[in-house]
Amino acid sequence: MSVRKLKPITPGQRFRVVNGYDAITTDKPERSLIAPIKNSGGRNSQGKMTMRYTGGGHKQRYRIIDFKRTKDGIPATVKSIEYDPNRTAFIALLAYADGEKTYIIAQNGLKVGQKLVSGPESQPEIGNTLPLSRIPLGTVISCIELRPGQGAVIARSAGTFAQLMARDGKYATIKMPSGETRLILLTCSATIGAVSNSDHQLVVSGKAGRTRWLGRRPRTRPVAMNPVDHPMGGGEGRSSGGHPRSRNGLPAKGYRTRSKKNPSNKYIVERRKK
């Protein structure tokens, strides 16, 4: 993994830092595993805006990812490491021994030609998926299930990982990417290794246009709005906006919004550090 800093031959390239894409082996996706995406522009079925600051961007096709890895005991070969425009991590194309092909989230260190196996009998090696009950303590893991059979929902972004800290009864203690320590059932599965493209955090857009290519629109500062649009809007001249607030009036900058009655609170051993 590496990044490239471009020469400042234009204003848009002066501060731009791009991904080197050293790990990418092909730019042609598997046609049987892609699907169309309709750009909603942040609007719902009624045409009303439900998400601000999104819309436009380059046309993309969705890559169908296997987050469950349920083909236990069937060996698979890594055919390629590919770029996915819909996520920050790279993806890997697997060809199973029975002829099926699937995409998975690629882990750091995954190579073309490598053999992968999922299931409780597989070895704890990079890219293999096992139940938490069969993973050695202290192992770096990613693509973790929160409920058995649900599919991976935790640690799927570029460079993220969690760590298996302990086992007690029917639960495993996991150090989450956020720093939170949480209990997860031992029957949930996880993949060995950290997620690929760990240098993604070093990428700098360099110009507003490239951010628009990604489908992100300009964000309006709350203090520049009218009072009808935001609690921090209005005032004579350039005002500070008063106490920082969110759009719906809740205090910003450190205010805890998590419900004290949330049923999953009992599974949190230690809150994340702020």
Curated annotation (Swiss-Prot):
Coiled coil: none annotated. Keywords: Ribonucleoprotein, Ribosomal protein, RNA-binding, rRNA-binding. GO terms for cellular component: large ribosomal subunit. It holds the Pfam family Ribosomal_L2_C. GO terms for biological process: cytoplasmic translation. GO terms for molecular function: rRNA binding; structural constituent of ribosome; transferase activity. The keyword Ribonucleoprotein applies. The keyword RNA-binding applies. Residues 214-274 are annotated as: Disordered. NCBIfam families: rplB_bact (TIGR01171). Belongs to the universal ribosomal protein uL2 family. One of the primary rRNA binding proteins. Required for association of the 30S and 50S subunits to form the 70S ribosome, for tRNA binding and peptide bond formation. It has been suggested to have peptidyltransferase activity; this is somewhat controversial. Makes several contacts with the 16S rRNA in the 70S ribosome. Part of the 50S ribosomal subunit. Forms a bridge to the 30S subunit in the 70S ribosome. This is Large ribosomal subunit protein uL2. It comes from Flavobacterium johnsoniae (strain ATCC 17061 / DSM 2064 / JCM 8514 / BCRC 14874 / CCUG 350202 / NBRC 14942 / NCIMB 11054 / UW101) (Cytophaga johnsonae). The gene is rplB.
